[in-house]
From Swiss-Prot:
Locations listed in the record: Cell membrane
Family: Belongs to the class VI-like SAM-binding methyltransferase superfamily. PEMT/PEM2 methyltransferase family.
Full protein name: PEMT/PEM2 methyltransferase family protein
Organism: Sinorhizobium sp
Transmembrane segments: 3-23, 51-71, 82-102, 141-161
Amino acid sequence: MSTTLPTILMLVVGLSTLALAILRRVQSGRSPVVLTYGDDAEGFAGRLFRLIVAALVIHLLAVAMLPASVDAALGRIPALDTPILHAVGLALMTLGGGLTMLSQWAMRHSWKIGIPEKQDAPLVTSGLYAFSRNPIYVGMVTALIGTVMAVPNVISVALALSAWISISYQIRMEETHLAKVFGDAYGAYCRRVRRWV
C-alpha cells in the first residue's frame, strides 16, 4: 500500500473544507468558523478538536514522508496489517471524506464549524440530513475508521478514539443549541431522524 494515499485523501478533505469556508466568507461576509477560545465547555471542545486535527495531519504526514521510521517507532497492529484491510481502509477514508464534503456543501449557508452565537440560517433536514442528523460527523468517523485500517498503528487508534469522543461531545452541545433555537421543529426532526444513521 502506498503510504501517501491516506495523507492525500485527508488533504483533499481539508482543502475542500477550506475552500468551502472561503466561499462562505466571500458570499456572506462572515467566517463560517465560529469555534470559540473561551474557558467554557464549548471553548474546550474547540481546542480539543483543533488539537486532534493537527495531530492527525502531523501523523499522516510523518507516515507519508518517513514510513520506515514511523513503523520502527510505533510498530503496526498485526491484526489490521493486511493488504485487504489496507484497501478497505482506503475505501472507507474515500467514502467518509466524500460524505463529509458532500454534507458540508449540502448545508449551504447553514454550515458552520462550531456553534454560532446567533443562528441566522435555517435548519437543514433534507437530502443527506433526512437520513442522519449528523452526516458530516458520520463521514468523519467513517474516514477515521478507514485511517486505522489503512495506517494500523497505535497513534491512528488513539486519534480515532479521541476524535470519536470529541465529536460525540460536540454533537450533544449542538443538539442543545439547536433545540433552543428551533424548538418543536428540531424536536420533530430528532424523532424522525437518528443522530448517526
